[in-house]
Amino acid sequence: MSAIVDIVGREILDSRGNPTVECDVLLESGTMGRAAVPSGASTGSREAIELRDGDKKRYLGKGVLKAVENINTEISESVLGLDASEQAFLDRTMIDLDGTDNKGRLGANATLAVSMAVARAAAEESGLPLYRYFGGMGGMQLPVPMMNVINGGAHANNSLDLQEFMIIPVGAPSFREAVRYGAEVFHALKKILGDRGISTAVGDEGGFAPSVESHEAAIQLILEAIDKAGFVAGEQIALGLDCAASEFYKDGNYVLSGENLTLSAGNWADMLATWVDKYPIISIEDGMHEGDWDGWKLLTERLGKRVQLVGDDLFVTNTKILQEGIDKGIANSILIKINQIGTLTETFAAIEMAKRAGYTAVISHRSGETEDSTIADIAVGTNAGQIKTGSLSRSDRIAKYNQLLRIEEDLGDIASYPGRGAFYNLK
């Protein structure tokens, strides 16, 4: 038995300079696991609650000492002595201890930190790399990265309403080559922007944050960079968008303030469909407001067989909401963010539910990240097939890419890279 003998929570900083929660878990054998949780900027209204202190005199109210105290008192008292290898039982213990539907009492940032740290300790105790601990012998597929090279919306201070413009190296023969494709396009884009006197400052997720005249102008810059780097758009590198449409939904319309446009759901769907016709876009995330299920239904009927339609704010990694979406034929993919739900067990349940329904599951970072690379191991351990972890800059993003490179090396000849096959939800 790998008994838990000590748990220590602490307040650390994330990539935006805001406090977040880190946890150490010590086992009877002396083995220790450590994990830190991320934090989002654009969040779904039904996400599990991230507990903040609210003391404006300290970190502008964003301190997490209450969550840390919950780890060091209530949670610790409840899980000390439990077997670290019994992840589902441990997570259920914390869920029951919290007693709310959204972890609003203890904080999802507290429960997740413990859940992740326990898994790391148990993997170390068993002598397995974390991805192997999660997936057994079946975890051997590297994910296709969706690389956010231009940032807008809540992730940048510019004129773009859409939040992310991504490159997806579907034609790469391996993950290592996919990273190379992405890095070379990133540097080509930086050169193009610099030569035109456009800022090469980066946003929260490491992508550039230029002020350009339109969203199509941003897409065209990326296509130019792909060509400049020597790749073929659509064949070797496809495009993806994260609209984060809940952020610009006002009074029943979609308001693109940067282009001075106010659109109904139907007209907004028409605009997205036009872009799909013109450009090699194969994935659109949060194309409609999280509460606009009629708009989502319209978008799914319009593009659901041609484009991966990812629900992030829509589903918030919650199996109850995902099941409703599956039943109603809404979207065809779910974004998986571990801190939206607050335990690893519930995260894995959402991934499994999506796969059974023929939906893809895209493992994702948050805009506020740390050096913790657990999501890389989750992506491989669950054979998810896709990952979003930012651009090719900022060490908080690169940490995940580097961990995936190590995993690919560890797997050796049995490592696989699905490429376009990761988009099995497209007909």
Swiss-Prot record:
Disulfide bonds: none
Active site: 205, 337
Cofactor section: Mg(2+)
The organism's place on the tree of life at top rank: Bacteria
Catalytic activity: (2R)-2-phosphoglycerate = phosphoenolpyruvate + H2O
GO molecular function, one term: magnesium ion binding
Top EC category: lyase
Residues given in the record as Mg(2+) binding sites: 242, 285, 312
Cofactor-binding details, from the entry: Binds a second Mg(2+) ion via substrate during catalysis.
EC number: 4.2.1.11
Any one GO biological process: glycolytic process
GO cellular component, one term: phosphopyruvate hydratase complex
A Pfam family of this chain: Enolase_C
Annotated keywords: Cytoplasm, Glycolysis, Lyase, Magnesium, Metal-binding, Secreted
Family indicated by similarity: Belongs to the enolase family.
Function: Catalyzes the reversible conversion of 2-phosphoglycerate (2-PG) into phosphoenolpyruvate (PEP). It is essential for the degradation of carbohydrates via glycolysis.
Protein name, per record: Enolase
Biological source species: Variovorax paradoxus (strain S110)
Gene name, Swiss-Prot/TrEMBL: eno
